[in-house]
């Protein structure tokens, strides 16, 4: 079983990020088990980490304005350009009709990864 969300594709990953930004119940359910390393692109990893960092500090999702400010502070122009493009793509999915399906699949995937990692760690003890 793959440890990343690559098998679901880039559009699916954008919908996960859209869900993180738009659905309070989803972010509350998944914030502790979703890892940026599960995403395939550096841009998606950066977005997920930024959303998580903001959520852990302020207990709510960042707005588009907050993300824009964070992007402006980036030093890496190549990554900055990629993040802007991914955020545009993500924003197109904010009201996608299949977000419930995406959220369920993502939650199941993350729970399985967490369980798998816990089992592997216990074997190493």
Predicted regions, residues:
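Noncatalytic partner-interaction/assembly domains of nucleic-acid and motor enzyme complexes
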Residues: 1-109
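Short secondary-structure subsegments characteristic of cysteine-rich extracellular domains
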Residues: 114-125
């Amino acid at each position: 079983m793959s440890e990343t969300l690559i098998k679901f594709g880039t559009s699916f990953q954008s919908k996960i990020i859209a869900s993180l930004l738009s659905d309070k119940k989803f972010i509350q359910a998944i914030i502790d088990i979703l890892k940026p390393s599960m995403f395939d692109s550096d841009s998606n990893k950066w977005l997920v980490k930024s959303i998580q960092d903001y959520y852990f500090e302020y207990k709510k999702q960042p707005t588009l304005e907050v993300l824009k400010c964070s992007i402006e502070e980036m030093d890496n122009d190549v990554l900055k350009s990629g993040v802007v493009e991914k955020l545009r793509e993500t924003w197109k999915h904010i009201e996608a009709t299949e977000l419930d399906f995406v959220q369920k699949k993502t939650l199941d995937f993350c729970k399985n990864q967490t369980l798998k990692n816990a089992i592997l760690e216990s074997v190493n003890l």
